[in-house]
């Protein structure tokens, strides 16, 4: 948005770029947003935190919305007098950096720190009130040394163990793939068919905390979104059921096949059992039958992701083995099936085709028996999965679920063929990753001593940072200086662990490190943690509901038990912001997919309502399809560059728009044209302030010396001035309630716009320009700008300074109860229920006076020609006169 030099010097014009740079420089110079841990014990502290970003190198609108939300709340609570901590850091390890490094042939460390520099500069242009003195990146040894130290403490406690885990293996790149890197059963980079492979990995015993993680969700009710709480409950998945043992007679090593079921009432309907390819019975069968061995190998190929298995075709093979049904004594065939995972439960399931959809599908495919044991409606087709009355179950016929559960348990438990059991869907957290760009695991592998923890004195175990990975295997294995070491236990030659930590480790405790980020003597300073934790308001996407948020809750409990923090939960309140959406433009391509285009490359026509009607690609003049409104993404080319928008309209306009256009927890449909509304609003505020300054100067007065509006006797103000004072203090009260109680971030902007309109009306209609009316106008403007500074801090503080306000001492304005009292109220007058007039009356006017005044109104009197049957008065609202005929 270009301007000529004379315009730039004109105070009546709003030039956001100039004032925003000026205000940001002031904030940086006086370290406005830095907070000390040495503040008074009596100070009210508040910790506001948005989920820290991965340093991709460029902000997107999702970032802008996320950080603006937490910044508005931070600025509001500072106005309320709180000591507010709003820090920023970088979730800097992880696969994206490694992949980018491979593609660009650059060391991930160099790529990452360059991106951090770019994103920090972008964040600062948004005017965020961040304490940058606490900034850190998780890929620095100063941070991850404490992660390594904490791992060693957990290892000593027995909360860490090592076991074989089944992973996705790319045989060409010789590397482990995350589930999302498996595309149609093939490696995303090499295109090679993915295999399952067992490799040793370290695990955290998160299941030891399953009950506490589940039960403590009750403490978050009303403070976290209910859908997030539900997702965590389902993810932990506490199930009460029965473990049933099916005897196996043909092996000295295997006495029973153990299965867990939440539906023991269907036990009499079991017609086969299914086991994973890695189960001991499957291996036993594979040793005897090459075809079964071949099938088991087939099952080991493909993704190990639960979601992928759910979509995959269910296949199986009869092992020829049988187990004994614990109730009937009948022999039940054992099948190996691809839908059973060894990593879930015992790696075996009892199959009841009549009452389980997956078992029903499998049984029909392989012509296996289907036995109904729950009374089923006659017209029902397929598997009947509801609970009900038992049938075809011998002595258990006629029992309901609870009755059959107890009866079967009473019969089987004395024979050690069943036991009551609680099982969790939650599995222990595998924290090993076969990747380079991550925190090294502080363990040593000794041929004689096994797995040995590193001496704490040797921490941090530093990751070599000058490595340029090629995507084939873990490069750490090929660095002798890193790998070769001595065993801390026996002193002999040994090798360092080359796996690195899951990056969820870094993001599980970063919030606590912000309390004492520069402490090089301990992971978390307890006194500082007690001062700031728990986080008062956490802001982030709902997509983190069951990974990051669950692991952070787990980590907090671990740190609590280590004496590092207090309290049971890390985040007191959680706000999950909605996604930012935008329209898409595309053409179908010959490959059967879609080619998406940037909006800047397309000429779009609109109808009278502003709806797009036609889109033409500028490059060839041919039409493109106007697609759905979808989440902004690189793949859809529908993202909006925040910096471009800031350069055009200013950061204050972008901040206002992202919060005004939709409630914070709902999706925001981006529209470039809609930015003009907030931009014009800020220009209006600018003009009103300039008008006030000019009017004050014309009377030879100074804004700093105007009397306080509250000190002026109300009798000296006309109705226009009283109305402006009333609106001013109504807005003070409403915004305080919206932000402090309701956490409604869009409605305050509407209130600010209403107040600006009221000020504009006052300026245009006020005929008595004097010290008193200027004082009322001044109060309204200072209030408007103070509250506006929460959303649009640059223009807000800049104009406040013009009005003589010290912005370093800014506080939330106090509502004046006297100003809220109305001298008159407007009442509606109806005749036979139809509005015929209005009247201004004093509050509390008696009913008879109201009736008389209503009938005297000219527009009402002409309808009172018949007999008056009834006169209804609703105090302070309306008078309704009922007339005959």
Curated annotation (Swiss-Prot):
Protein name as catalogued: Leucine--tRNA ligase
Catalyzed reactions per annotation: tRNA(Leu) + L-leucine + ATP = L-leucyl-tRNA(Leu) + AMP + diphosphate
Gene Ontology molecular-function annotations: aminoacyl-tRNA deacylase activity; ATP binding; leucine-tRNA ligase activity
PANTHER family: LEUCINE--TRNA LIGASE, MITOCHONDRIAL, LEUCYL-TRNA SYNTHETASE
Gene it is expressed from: leuS
Keywords: Aminoacyl-tRNA synthetase, ATP-binding, Cytoplasm, Ligase, Nucleotide-binding, Protein biosynthesis
Entries under InterPro entries matching the protein: aa-tRNA-synth_I_CS (IPR001412), aa-tRNA-synth_Ia (IPR002300), Leu-tRNA-ligase (IPR002302), Leu_tRNA-synth_edit (IPR025709), M/V/L/I-tRNA-synth_anticd-bd (IPR013155), Rossmann-like_a/b/a_fold (IPR014729), tRNAsynth_Ia_anticodon-bd (IPR009080), Val/Leu/Ile-tRNA-synth_edit (IPR009008)
Organism the protein comes from: Psychrobacter sp. (strain PRwf-1)
Subcellular location: Cytoplasm
Matches recorded under Pfam families: Anticodon_1 (PF08264), tRNA-synt_1 (PF00133), tRNA-synt_1_2 (PF13603)
Positions occupied by motif 'HIGH' region: 53-63
Amino-acid positions noted as binding ATP in the UniProt annotation, renumbered to this chain: 634
Any one GO biological process: leucyl-tRNA aminoacylation
GO cellular component, one term: cytosol
EC number: 6.1.1.4
Enzyme class: ligase
Motif 'KMSKS' region per record, residues: 631-635
């Amino acid at each position: 948005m270009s301007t000529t030099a004379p315009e730039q010097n004109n105070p009546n014009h709003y030039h956001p770029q100039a004032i925003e740079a000026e205000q940001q420089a002031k904030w940086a110079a006086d370290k406005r947003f830095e907070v000390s841990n040495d503040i008074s014990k009596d100070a009210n502290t508040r910790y506001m935190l948005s989920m820290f970003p991965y340093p991709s190198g460029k902000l997107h609108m999702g970032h802008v919305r996320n950080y603006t939300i937490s910044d508005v709340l931070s600025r509001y609570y500072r106005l309320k007098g709180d000591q507010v901590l709003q820090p920023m850091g970088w979730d800097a390890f992880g696969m994206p950096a490694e992949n980018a490094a491979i593609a660009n042939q650059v060391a991930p460390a160099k790529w990452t720190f360059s991106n951090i520099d770019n994103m920090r500069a972008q964040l600062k242009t948004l005017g965020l009130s961040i304490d940058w003195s606490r900034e850190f990146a998780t890929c620095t040894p100063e941070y991850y040394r404490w992660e390594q130290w904490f791992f060693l403490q957990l290892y000593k406690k027995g909360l860490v163990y090592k076991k074989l885990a089944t992973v996705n293996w790319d045989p060409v790149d010789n590397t482990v793939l995350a589930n999302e890197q498996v595309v149609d059963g093939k490696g995303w980079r090499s295109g090679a068919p993915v295999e399952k492979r067992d490799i040793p990995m370290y695990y955290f015993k998160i299941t030891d905390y399953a009950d506490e993680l589940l039960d403590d969700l009750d403490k978050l009710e009303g403070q976290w979104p209910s859908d997030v709480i539900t997702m965590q409950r389902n993810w932990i998945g506490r199930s009460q059921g029965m473990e049933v043992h099916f005897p196996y007679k043909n092996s000295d090593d295997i006495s029973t096949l153990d299965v867990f079921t939440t539906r023991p009432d269907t036990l009499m309907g079991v017609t086969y059992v299914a086991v994973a390819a890695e189960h001991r019975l499957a291996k036993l069968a594979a040793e005897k039958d090459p075809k079964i061995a071949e099938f088991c190998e087939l099952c080991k190929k493909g993704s190990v992701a639960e979601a992928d298995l759910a979509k995959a075709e269910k296949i199986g093979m009869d092992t020829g083995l049988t187990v004994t049904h614990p109730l009937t004594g009948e022999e039940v065939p054992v099948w190996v099936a691809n839908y059973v995972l060894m990593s879930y439960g015992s790696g075996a399931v009892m199959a009841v085709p009549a009452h389980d959809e997956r078992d029903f599908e499998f049984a029909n495919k392989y012509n296996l028996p289907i036995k109904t044991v729950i009374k089923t409606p006659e017209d029902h087709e397929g598997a009947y999965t509801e609970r009900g009355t038992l049938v075809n179950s011998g002595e258990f016929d006629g029992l309901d679920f609870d009755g059959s559960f107890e009866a079967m348990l009473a019969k089987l438990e004395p024979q050690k063929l069943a036991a009551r059991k609680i099982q969790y869907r939650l599995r222990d957290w595998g924290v090993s990753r076969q990747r380079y760009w991550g925190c090294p695991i502080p363990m040593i592998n000794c041929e004689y001593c096994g797995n040995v923890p590193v001496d704490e004195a040797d921490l941090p175990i530093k990751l070599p940072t000058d490595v340029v990975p090629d995507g084939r295997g873990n490069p750490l294995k090929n660095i002798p200086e890193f790998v070769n070491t001595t065993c801390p236990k026996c002193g002999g030659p040994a090798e360092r662990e080359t796996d690195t930590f899951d990056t969820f480790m870094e993001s599980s405790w970063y919030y606590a490190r912000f309390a004492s980020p520069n402490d090089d003597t301990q992971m978390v300073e307890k006194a500082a943690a007690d001062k700031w934790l728990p986080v008062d308001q956490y802001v982030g996407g709902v997509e983190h509901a069951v990974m990051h948020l669950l692991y952070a809750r787990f980590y907090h409990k671990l740190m609590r038990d280590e004496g590092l923090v207090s309290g049971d939960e890390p985040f007191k309140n959680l706000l999950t912001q909605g996604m930012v959406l935008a329209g898409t433009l595309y053409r179908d391509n010959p490959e059967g997919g879609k080619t998406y285009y940037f909006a800047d490359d397309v000429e779009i026509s609109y109808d009278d309502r502003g709806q797009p009607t036609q889109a033409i690609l500028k490059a060839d003049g041919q039409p493109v399809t106007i697609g759905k409104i979808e989440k902004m993404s690189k793949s859809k080319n529908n993202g909006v560059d925040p910096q471009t928008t800031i350069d055009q309209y200013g950061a204050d306009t972008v901040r206002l728009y992202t919060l005004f256009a939709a409630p914070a927890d709902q999706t925001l449909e981006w529209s470039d044209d809609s930015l003009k509304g907030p931009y014009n609003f800020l220009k209006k505020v600018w003009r009103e302030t300039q008008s006030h300054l000019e009017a004050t100067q014309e009377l030879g007065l100074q804004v700093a010396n105007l009397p306080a509006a509250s000190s002026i006797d109300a009798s000296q103000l006309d109705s226009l001035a009283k109305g402006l004072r009333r609106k001013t203090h109504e807005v003070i009260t409403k915004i305080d309630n919206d932000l402090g109680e309701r956490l409604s971030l869009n409605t305050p902007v509407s209130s600010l716009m209403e107040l600006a309109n009221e000020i504009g009306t006052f300026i245009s209609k006020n005929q008595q320009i004097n010290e008193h009316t200027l004082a009322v106008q001044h109060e309204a403007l200072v209030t408007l700008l103070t509250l506006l500074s929460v959303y649009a801090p640059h223009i807000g503080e800049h104009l406040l300074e013009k009005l003589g306000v010290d912005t370093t001492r800014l506080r939330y304005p106090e509502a004046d109860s006297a100003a809220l009292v109305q001298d008159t109220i407007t009442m509606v007058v109806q005749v036979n229920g139809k509005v015929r007039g209005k009247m201004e009356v004093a509050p509390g006017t008696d009913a008879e006076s109201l009736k008389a005044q209503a009938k005297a109104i000219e527009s009402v009197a002409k309808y009172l020609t018949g007999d008056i049957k009834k006169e209804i008065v609703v105090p302070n609202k309306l008078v309704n006169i009922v007339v005959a005929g």
